[in-house]
Amino acid sequence: MRMSLKLVAAAAALASVFALTACDDKGSTAKKAEEPKAAAETKTAANEPLKVGFVYVAPIADVGYTKQHDIGRLYAIDKVGKDKITTTFVENVPETADAERVIRQMINDGNKLIFGTSFGYMNYMQKLAKEYPDVKFEHATGYKSAPNMTNYNIRFYEGRYLAGMLAGGATKSNVIGYVAPFPIPEVLQGINAFTLGAKSVNPKIQVKVVWTNAWYDPPKDTDSAKTLIGQGADVLTQHTNTSAVASAAEAAGKMVIPYNSDMKSVAPNAQIAALVLN
């Protein structure tokens, strides 16, 4: 089961290239002798690649949410061209004032398009968007915006509903375990859609949730999975950024429907499907 993560990085980058290098006709009182120099400078700026920064909440592992975003970054370079954009990224940026510091440094380094890939970056990005109107900001899963800041997400809840249906048909214990990070809108949407899907095929289903309060914490994910298995869950899923739940399901002989990436590499027997952000 695959879903399309519409980062629109390539399109956004190209749009920004033209928007940010557009010439302003105001103040055209420069001396005629200086006009050739100004024209040359404008041409040079127009030919420079757009600098794009990506801020990641977790490391780029073999699988997971951050890995899928980085695949999108590399895809943008391939499709737009290295002569048009250059990218940089910072991993393991917490959803604290550190995010503002990292993004501000990216701006100081000349990045004109910033992708903030985690919900908790929202307020910091909105603040910086107001400070730097000539920089474009793309924020994942949030709801605040500015003239130069927009949001992006996918209709992942549709896939969650289908995954719930599959889990509801596969379980023998009628207990499904769900490892979740934070009770934010995106995560709650996923839990609700998954539960509705499961109950549509098996009204007796119980969906039990364990909160980790972390996007990336493999030991917590493992412990949470073990807790849910101990409570009778024979099918697991997760909204966190690790493969630990899939690994725990594999080790316990249970079933798993991973989120973000295909995790058959760590759960070849346990994985019955995967929601892949593609």
Language model regions located:
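Bacterial N-terminal signal peptides that target proteins for export
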Residues: 1-10
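C-terminal motif of bacterial Sec signal peptides marking the signal peptidase cleavage site
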Residues: 18-22
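A residue-level marker of the well-folded mature domains of exported/periplasmic proteins
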Residues: 23-278
